[in-house]
A protein has these predicted regions:
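A short, polar/charged loop-to-alpha-helix boundary motif
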Residues: 43-58
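Short beta->alpha transition motifs characteristic of CBS
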Residues: 34-43
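Glycine-rich phosphate-binding loop at the start of an alpha helix
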Residues: 5, 49, 53, 77, ...
Length: 167
């Protein structure tokens, strides 16, 4: 197992905090390997509080000096445009993700159709390397299971609220 897989396994574990929205993220000092911050989806509190934003906010409030650090963001899914832009503004030099936006879309997840690669390309003032597909099958399985559960739960709620029976 390489370092990217090790940290992605941690992101997958963090995603378990919200199994219906399994977006887990962590920020690592790429030189020392120290985990600086962790996060997961908290959109039930704030619609912009994605896993990546949670990790970035945690790092910002930690008091850790990040200027000049080789920051790496690990996340179970390719960052949406908001999260990728936040990573750039935060000085993150590398983003490593599992599931792609395209894969999420194929599984039924609503996504803004702008890839992280395009956000980076349109932001020449920053350098940020993207590495996708790390433990992709494991991450894809997380999102497929969550989507199945979300669809099954909403069907059940609709059935019960319309007077149907679950017997």
């Amino acid at each position: 197992m390489n370092d990217h897989e090790l940290y992605m396994r941690r992101a997958i574990a963090l995603a378990a905090n919200v199994p219906d929205l399994p977006f887990g993220a962590l920020i690592v000092d790429g030189d020392s390997g120290t985990i600086l911050s962790e996060g997961w989806n908290k959109t039930s509190v704030n619609p912009t509080w994605h896993g990546e934003i949670d990790a970035i906010n945690g790092l910002a409030s930690s008091g850790v000096l990040v200027e000049g650090k080789n920051l790496v963001l690990y996340t179970t899914a390719e960052p949406c445009p908001m999260c990728q832009a936040a990573a750039l503004w935060s000085g993150i030099k590398m983003v490593v993700f599992g599931t792609s936006i395209r894969s999420l879309q194929r599984s039924g997840w609503r996504q803004i159709d702008i890839l992280a690669e395009e956000v980076v390309r349109c932001s020449p003032a920053w350098n940020c390397k993207l590495i996708g597909g790390v433990l992709e099958r494991d991450c894809d399985a997380l999102f497929q299971k969550a989507m199945f559960h979300r669809v099954s739960s909403s069907d059940l709620i609709s059935l019960v609220s319309s007077g149907g029976s679950v017997e």
